[in-house]
Amino acid sequence: ANPIKVHGLILRTGLIQKLSNGNSIQVLFSPRLMTDFRNIDSRHFQFGGTFIYKKVYHKRLKIGYGILYNQETFGPNVVPLVNLEWKISERWSMSGLLPIYSKVKYKVNEKLNVGIHHFGLVTSYRLGEETYQNDYIERRSIDLGLFARYNIVGGIHIEGRYGYSFGRSYSQYNQDDKIDLALPLATIRDNRTQLNESSNFSNGAYAHVRLVY
């Protein structure tokens, strides 16, 4: 069979309400199209969002507490969140939406930042290809690596990343093979049967370059 190519398009919209004490409430709605772009129907769409209450501890430290919910193809996915903005010094800072992603950044000069980053989030993709039309793919990976971001002009940056992916898998399941609940370190009533056990991915290096605005 031909290789399966999956894609994700995510729209984020919502509101941020500033409070009188300087803290804020953020509510985001995040519909997703997670698909192989074959025979797309309503089952290729997912709906979810995040809620975060952000507290200002001082001008260099803001921490938000919240939750992410998304209705994945395999069932509901719930992730407790910690949103961090910490300016450690004039050159060092740390930011992220833990446990999904984070960055430790060093400011080399006004245009160049370098540092360490991580990204880890379970995602799922509905398949429309006729051979696999009743199946979905569940992707798992934790990416850890180095990055460099350069400001080209205005708010446009170019960023390069190089690192290593741990626990990488693209597991294939039947559309009716679901779980009751997914959490960051556990799944509730997960009795699924993987359909592609012979094609498991191994850990490995990754590298990519992207434009950021």
Locations of regions flagged by a protein language model:
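Transmembrane beta-strands of outer-membrane beta-barrel pores
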Residues: P31-F37, I67-T73, I88, I100, ...
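Extracellular loop and loop/strand-boundary signature of outer-membrane beta-barrel proteins
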Residues: A1, M34-N39, L68-N70, S89, ...
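Flexible, surface-exposed loop regions and adjacent strand-edge segments
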Residues: N2-P3, R43-F47, P80-E85, T131-D135, ...
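Outer-membrane beta-barrel "beta-signal"
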Residues: L81-E85, A148, G154, S199-Y213
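Repeated loop/turn-to-beta-strand initiation elements of outer-membrane beta-barrel proteins
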Residues: G22-V27, K59-G64, R91-M94, K111-V114, ...
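Outer-membrane beta-barrel proteins
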Residues: A1, D36-I40, F74-N77, T123-E129, ...
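Outer-membrane beta-barrel strand-turn architecture
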Residues: Q17-N21, K55-K59, I88-E90, V108-E110, ...
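Residues that define the transmembrane beta-barrel architecture of outer-membrane proteins
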Residues: P3-L9, D41-F47, P76-P80, L98, ...
